[in-house]
Swiss-Prot record:
This is Selenocysteine insertion sequence-binding protein 2-like. Residues 988-1002, 1040-1057 have a biased composition (Acidic residues). Residues 255-265, 925-939 have a biased composition (Low complexity). It comes from Homo sapiens. The modification Phosphoserine is found at S276.
Length: 1101
């Protein structure tokens, strides 16, 4: 026969209706049914007058079904059978014509083998494969249309199938068929190639010419042993490659069949892509719900038509590769829960969107099935390319090689990327799926790239934060005395260098291998497996699909959510404007600071800057900020005297400690990744707990949203963003706040710092727990966002109370540890300050004491005695100087003694005290100081005594300046004025010709011009001696001389006049003891004369 009879029978298909099985008596059916089944072979049986399709009724099939395992399809009988009965052809061919009543019965022929012998006989004359694929598919659909006419019979024979009688969509029977077939296989013995005869041989390419119609193949029950011996779950999913219409139909039967298995339809919202956990956790039947479409029936079709149908067959054989079998076997044997989800996705995969619950389930099983899903996606993906090929043999080989190659590449890339990522990257902590919501391939690709970038940025950020955690742990252990006192920043330099290398390598790979990386993220990265098979059509096989039928894909899928073609540009908020403005300022300061650091302090600060530079570069790229003054992780560079960052309310600096020491401690502890507003230690346990808590709440929220969006909006679990969190905190709706510790430092009014302080203040007022954990990017990944998130507010943690309580406990411990660490560091810093004060270099009387307070401040008179010593000699022997001064004071009046104490503490300042007079023009000031210094130097030249004399001079100067500080102030004023004078004189002296003296006094001072001439010094000495004699102001002169002697201590060493300071000191002491009252009375006059004399001396010189 040709296809003409087929077409003819299609026209006559309406006549099949009278032959409904129930219209015949059972006795008439028993005879023909018994003959073939009892004999085990139909070869010797006479054709029966009754149509064989009538024998498919339930009672007969059930009785004799087990005997039909042997070849029933003899050509003679099958060919002769229809001749006596004119209805034979009619019942057979209407299958192709999609006649509902007959097709209903043939739907179950696949399960009940009785009619197969007769049916197949009609088609034996067709030697060529039936190539009309789409007709075959339509026929299959037609076959499944009226499956519900026999629900009760099915229920009787196969009790596991439910008794649903309502009409179902096309394809809804397919899951039933697979379920029933599985049970039939369990009932009957293994079948030995029942279909191995000419027309039904299934496997090899040699049987191409003997393949029957696709419809018959789909209805064939007795399969080759390689297929029949497999369990249902082991069959491959060729349904994936059916036409798009078939894919769309497959979703509905899945929903209905799953509802038959006990899950309500509310649990399965195929349109929204939501599947409840109850659904996916069903028994093996549930696993077969969607896999059935793709698996068993298509396996039958493809195996029966191995060479007949072009791409259906190809995909079938391609998917029968061993990896699939192994995976499915694992599913069928033990891993039902996990693999069920994968296989269940196979049916939905073609629909192009996965469900949120599936994402969550996959998220849980991700670590176990990561490689499995990647291999599965690779197995299924290259098969999409098979659509282009018709040479099955050649493509078979190609497909195998392609699969292996792709998978190897995939594993290489995934392992490479994951190995290169930092050990504690959020891949190990933040395991959330990437929310690819679009169904358009191009947009999905862009979303995928964004997701990849977000993942890598999160990994980098968290690696930096983990370094910060290590630093804090070291500080904690150091505070507890567990480690030596090596500075933390030494180790951090290496860590930063390593991190920089990692980041550069990642960026290089991202630039060069963008495409493979995106593939890797889809399958391998733990937080990317939404379900790799589910994502496949849009991600990995995207090139094939795009070139093949991208239009069809785009049009066949309903868009989920709002998707704007052109995103509307958002106007920056007030906060964003402030942030952007300060960023620009910081960038400007970065260039200036960089130049300054490179020029002024090439050794010490340059090293600090290098250490911090990689982090600054990263921060510029990631968040747009650039602030070298932050000096991200090196505490040494953060020890600048004044940190302009407002002290956070939770930090120790706000606890009433007003000393600069506390603020410097805070500056040393905190960095760009651990800002000052944090008052707890960062640790991994808190990060993990926060991640789990947020993921749990997000899953709750999404699940409710899938069921009832209105209710979900009313019962939100989370809120993100500073503005939203602040708004809801004002409404007292927030139960917990999670803040990122690495928010950008924006100190302008209305900036980020102010907003964060407001949030923390409100949390304190409302007694809401606030936690500092993760980082901005990692926090965003926890809540399924690709953008960074600074603050997350929790409305309701019901359902995750254990995690929440654990988080609160960990936070309290971290806060206590932070306080201990700060206290220990403050104590340590104070100790170091006492030890290292002497070693700090000073310049022109400006002290650099621990509090960073300059000598300019009046209040620092008492607090700065040590650091005010300028000469190296005095730095090392300041205690001797104090003792000497005390001894001299004892010989003086009590008033002078008091003044001595105040000023003796600052012997280095006193050298400059005489110039305070010199708040006049430089010449005048120099006059007084030069006269005094010249006298001091002349005396020094006369006596040339050793440095102990210098110490005496210093003490005498201190006492003298106590009584007369050179600014016409008496003892009452002297202590305060002396402090002011200490700085100004030095500054003035720098400007004067006494650069020589200064140079000698301060060899380390930057202004060092040695232009001292012995003749000039001698003239100064002689003039100062004259003034001393005439004015009888030995004290004043001595004081000025002492100033000059201090400043010119080195000058004295170089010049031979070093001897005279001792003489002057003796004369000064004698004068001081002789006439303290005269000193007071004639302060101003003597000073004025000194000025004139000094001017004269300078002019003469």
């Amino acid at each position: 026969m040709d296809r003409a009879p087929t077409e003819q029978n299609v026209k006559l298909s309406a006549e099949v209706e009278p032959f409904i099985p129930q219209k015949k008596s059972p006795d008439t059916f028993m005879i023909p049914m018994a003959l073939p089944n009892d004999n085990g072979s139909v070869s010797g049986v006479e054709p029966t007058p009754i149509p064989s399709y009538l024998i498919t009724c339930y009672p007969f099939v059930q009785e004799n079904q087990s005997n039909r395992q042997f070849p029933l399809y003899n050509n003679d009988i099958r060919w002769q059978q229809p001749n006596p009965n004119p209805t034979g052809p009619y019942f057979a061919y209407p299958i192709i014509s999609a006649q509902p009543p007959v097709s209903t019965e043939y739907t179950y022929y696949q399960l009940m083998p009785a009619p197969c012998a007769q049916v197949m006989g009609f088609y034996h004359p067709f030697p060529t494969p039936y190539s009309n694929t789409f007709q075959a598919a339509n026929t299959v659909n037609a076959i499944t249309t009226e499956c519900t006419e026999r629900p009760s019979q099915l229920g009787q024979v196969f009790p596991l199938s439910s008794h649903r009688s309502r009409n179902s969509n096309r394809g809804s029977v397919v899951p039933k068929q697979q379920l029933l077939q599985q049970h039939i296989k369990s009932k009957r013995p293994l079948v030995k190639n029942v279909a191995t005869q000419k027309e039904t041989n299934a496997a090899g390419p040699d049987s191409r010419s003997k393949i029957v119609l696709l419809v018959d193949a789909s209805q064939q029950t007795d399969f080759p042993s390689d297929i029949a011996n497999k369990s249902l779950s082991e069959t491959t999913a060729t349904m994936l490659w059916k036409s798009k219409g078939r894919r769309r139909r497959a979703s509905h039967p899945t929903a209905e069949s799953s509802s038959e298995q006990g899950a309500s339809e509310a649990d399965i919202d195929s349109d929204s892509g939501y599947c409840s956990p109850k659904h996916s956790n069903n028994q093996p039947a549930a696993g077969a719900l969607r896999n059935p479409d793709s698996g068993t029936m298509n396996h039958v079709e493809s195996s029966m038509c191995a060479g007949g149908v072009n791409w259906s067959n190809v995909t079938c054989q391609a998917t029968q590769k061993k990896p699939w079998m192994e995976k499915n076997q694992t599913f069928s044997r033990g891993g039902r829960q996990t693999e069920q989800r994968n296989n269940s996705q196979v049916g939905f995969r073609c629909r192009g969107h996965s469900t949120s619950s599936e994402r969550r389930q996959n998220l849980q099983k991700r670590p176990d099935n990561k490689h499995l899903s990647s291999s599965q996606s690779h197995r299924s993906d290259p098969n999409s390319e098979s659509l282009y090929f018709e040479d099955e043999d050649g493509f078979q080989e190609l497909n195998e090689n392609g699969n292996a190659k792709d998978e190897n590449i995939q594993q290489k890339l995934s392992s490479k990327v994951l190995d290169d990522l930092p050990e504690n990257s959020p891949i190990n902590i933040v395991q959330t799926p990437i929310p690819i919501t679009t169904s358009v391939p191009k947009r999905a690709k862009s979303q995928k790239k964004k997701a990849l970038a977000a993942a890598l940025a999160t990994a980098q950020e968290y690696s930096e934060i983990s370094m910060e955690q290590k630093k804090l742990q070291e500080a904690l252990s150091k505070a507890a005395g567990k480690k030596n006192k090596t500075p933390v920043q030494l180790d951090l330099g290496d860590m930063l260098a390593a991190l920089e290398k990692q980041q550069q390598a990642m960026k290089a790979r991202q630039i060069t291998n963008t495409r493979p990386l995106s593939y890797t993220v889809v399958t391998a990265a733990s937080f990317h497996t939404k379900d790799s098979t589910n994502r496949k059509p849009l991600t990995k096989s995207q090139p094939c699909l795009t070139s093949f039928n991208s239009v069809d894909i785009a049009s066949s899928k309903a868009k989920k959510g709002k998707e704007k073609e052109i995103a509307k540009l958002k106007r920056p908020t007030a906060l964003k404007k402030v942030i952007l403005k300060e960023r620009e300022e910081k960038k400007g300061r970065l260039t200036v600071d960089h130049n300054l650091l490179g020029s002024e302090e090439p050794t010490e600060m340059h090293l600090d800057f290098i250490d911090d530079l990689p982090q600054e570069i990263v921060s510029q790229e990631d968040t747009g900020l650039s602030m070298p003054s932050d000096t991200s992780l090196s505490p040494a560079s953060q020890n600048s005297p004044y940190c302009m960052t407002p002290v956070s309310q939770g930090s120790p600096a706000s606890s009433g400690i007003g000393s600069p020491m506390a603020s410097s401690t805070i500056t040393k502890i905190h960095s760009k990744r651990f800002r000052e507003y944090c008052n707890q230690v960062l640790c991994k346990e808190i990060d993990e707990c926060v991640t789990l808590l947020l993921q749990e709440l997000v899953s709750f929220q999404e699940r409710i949203y899938q069921k009832d969006p209105v209710r979900a909006k009313a019962r939100r679990r989370l809120v993100m963003g500073l503005r939203e969190v602040t708004k809801h905190m004002k409404l007292n709706k927030i139960k917990c706040v999670i803040i990122s510790p690495n928010c950008e430092k924006i100190q302008s009014k209305g900036g980020l710092d102010e907003a964060l302080y407001n949030v923390i203040a409100m949390a304190r007022e409302q007694e809401i727990p606030f936690v500092f954990a993760l980082g901005r990017k990692a926090l965003g990944r926890c809540v399924n966002k690709l953008v960074p998130v600074s603050v997350v507010g929790i409305f309701n943690y019901f359902g995750a109370e254990s995690l929440f309580n654990k988080l609160v406990e960990l936070t309290e411990e971290a806060r206590k540890a932070y306080k201990d660490m700060v206290a220990a560091m403050e104590q340590e810093q104070a100790e170091e300050a006492l030890k290292n004060v002497k070693k700090v270099p000073h310049h022109m009387g400006h002290s650099r004491n621990p509090s960073a307070a300059s000598a300019i401040s009046f209040c620092s008179v008492i607090s700065e005695p040590i650091s005010e010593v300028n000469e190296k000699e005095y730095e090392t022997n300041w205690r001797n100087m104090v003792e000497t001064s005390d001894g001299l004071e004892a010989s003086e009046n009590e008033k002078e003694v008091s003044c001595k104490h105040s000023t003796s503490e600052k012997p280095s300042k006193l050298p400059f005290d005489t110039p305070p007079i010199g708040k006049q023009p430089s010449l005048v000031a120099t006059g007084s100081t030069t006269s005094a210094t010249s006298a001091g130097k002349s005396t020094a030249s006369d006596k040339e005594e050793v440095k102990p004399d210098d110490l005496e001079w210093a003490s005498q100067q201190s006492t003298e300046t106590g009584s007369l500080d050179g600014s016409c102030r008496d003892l009452l004023n002297s202590s305060i004025t002396s402090t002011t004078s200490t700085l100004v004189p030095g500054m003035l002296e720098e400007e004067e010709d006494e650069d020589e003296e200064e140079e000698e006094d301060y060899t380390h001072e930057p202004i060092s011009v040695e232009v001292q001439l012995n003749s000039r010094i001698e003239s100064w000495v002689s003039e100062t001696q004259r003034t001393m004699e005439t004015l009888q102001l030995g004290k004043t002169l001595n004081g000025s001389e002492e100033d000059n002697v201090e400043q010119s201590g080195e000058e004295e060493a170089e010049a031979p006049e070093v001897l005279e300071p001792g003489m002057d000191s003796e004369a000064w002491t004698a004068d001081q003891q002789a006439s303290p009252g005269q000193q007071k009375s004639s302060n101003c006059s003597s000073l004025n004369k000194e000025h004139s004399d000094s001017n004269y001396t300078t002019q003469t010189t």
